[in-house]
């Protein structure tokens, strides 16, 4: 076992630390298109900022989604259409010309015109009627008429404001967000209860949204970030999981759950640079605790995926030394070792 540990430590110490860029583009044109798109899309939360300028979580998610859609070969129009379908026309700074937008532009002008006409008509009427019939009561009557004059304009303005908010103010999204925030504690208790029914995908999504809102209010909650990372992994949302675990790891690099969760999220990412960064983090974890089965398992998986087959074999063999003889995982590990050995040269396999 000391020999295996020595081999594993030697392999780990021989690897250089890598520095990465978060996003990698095929060429400069694609990078420029990404910048233009993120500057043209409005953040649903920070309504005066684009998703390129906002640091909110939802803006981060949208930037990541734009990047993923671009890597899939989607055109600029297809990406904008995807965002509009999810968040409405409000998400773009240049909404399309529709009957509704025309109505919203015309209504204020009509309201001003009607209000002006009403004021003019009532003023003319007071000039004709008051001197002839009620000269001594002209001032009180004029005061009473003045309040009524503004009533039609106020009513029209309230209608315009209500319609505008309902159609462009993301009312439905705000309602869903408020419901998710209120339901988050109960959903979390249910998720942690092994006897309760498991959450479905929609409930998990609501839980993630509610937890993110709570963490915005309490950003130092390490356990909350770790739990959000687990929810993101369960949803298959790499952006949520990676960001949550990364935040927890920054808050407490010595927290093993945060470090291992972050390493796993990076390892399971579709970005090769994330995979390499995950491998470096796992090397540090192995140096700290070379008897942790979870760490060794994830390290072996990461090494195998990056074709570092010698490191993978050493980690799996270390696991075999640590696991009981009747552990069902041994058979899977032995098959993995045999598969990795096929990729080693005769000198490496000795």
UniProtKB/Swiss-Prot annotation:
Q: Which residues form the signal peptide?
A: 1-18
UniProt keyword list: Cell inner membrane, Cell membrane, Cytochrome c-type biogenesis, Heme, Iron, Membrane, Metal-binding, Repeat, Signal, TPR repeat, Transmembrane, Transmembrane helix
- Keyword Metal-binding in record: yes
Its localization reads:
Cell inner membrane
What cellular-component terms does GO give this entry? plasma membrane
Which GO terms of type biological process are on file? cytochrome complex assembly
The way it spans or sits in the membrane comes to: Multi-pass membrane protein
Q: Does the keyword Transmembrane apply?
A: yes
The chain's Periplasmic topological domains, given as residue ranges, are 19-96, 170-350
Q: Which domain of life is it from?
A: Bacteria
| Binding residues annotated for heme, in chain numbering | 43, 46
Which molecular function term from Gene Ontology is one that the record holds? protein-disulfide reductase activity
Spans of the TPR repeats are 222-255, 293-326
Q: Where are the transmembrane segments?
A: 97-119, 147-169
Q: Which family does it belong to?
A: Belongs to the CcmH/CycL/Ccl2/NrfF family.
Function field:
May be required for the biogenesis of c-type cytochromes. Possible subunit of a heme lyase.
Q: What is this protein called?
A: Cytochrome c-type biogenesis protein CcmH
Task: Look up and give the organism this protein is from.
Answer: Escherichia coli (strain K12)
Q: What is the lineage of its organism?
A: Bacteria, Pseudomonadati, Pseudomonadota, Gammaproteobacteria, Enterobacterales
GN (gene name): ccmH
């Amino acid at each position: 076992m000391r020999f295996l540990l020595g081999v594993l430590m030697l392999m780990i110490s021989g690897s250089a630390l890598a520095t990465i860029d978060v996003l990698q583009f095929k060429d400069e044109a694609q990078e420029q298109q990404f910048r233009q798109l993120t500057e043209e899309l409005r953040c649903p939360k920070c309504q005066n900022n684009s998703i390129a300028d906002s640091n909110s979580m939802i803006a981060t998610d949208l930037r990541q989604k734009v990047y993923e859609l671009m890597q899939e070969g989607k055109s600029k129009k297809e990406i904008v259409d995807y965002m509009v379908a999810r968040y409405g026309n409000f998400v773009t700074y240049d909404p399309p010309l529709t009957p509704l937008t025309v109505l919203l532009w015309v209504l204020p002008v009509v309201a001003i015109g009607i209000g002006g006409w009403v004021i003019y008509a009532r003023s003319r009427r007071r000039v004709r009627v008051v001197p002839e019939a009620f000269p001594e009561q002209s001032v009180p009557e004029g005061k009473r008429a003045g309040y009524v004059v503004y009533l039609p304009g106020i009513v029209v303005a309230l209608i315009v404001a209500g319609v505008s908010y309902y159609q462009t103010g993301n009312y439905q999204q705000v309602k869903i967000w408020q419901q998710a925030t209120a339901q988050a504690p109960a959903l979390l208790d249910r998720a942690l209860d092994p006897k309760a029914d498991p959450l479905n995908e929609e409930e998990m999504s609501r839980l993630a949204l509610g937890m993110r809102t709570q963490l915005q209010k309490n950003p130092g909650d390490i356990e909350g970030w770790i739990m959000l990372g687990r929810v993101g992994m369960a949803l298959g949302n790499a952006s949520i999981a990676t960001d949550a675990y990364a935040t927890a790891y920054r808050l407490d690099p010595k927290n093993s759950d945060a470090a291992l969760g972050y390493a796993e999220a990076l390892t399971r990412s579709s970005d090769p640079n994330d995979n390499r960064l995950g491998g470096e983090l796992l090397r540090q974890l192995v140096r700290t605790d070379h008897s942790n089965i979870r760490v060794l398992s994830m390290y072996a998986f990461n090494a195998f995926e990056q074709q570092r087959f010698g490191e993978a074999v050493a980690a799996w063999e270390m696991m075999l030394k640590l696991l009981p003889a009747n552990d069902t995982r041994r058979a899977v590990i032995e098959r993995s070792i045999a598969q990795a050995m096929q990729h080693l040269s005769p000198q490496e396999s000795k």
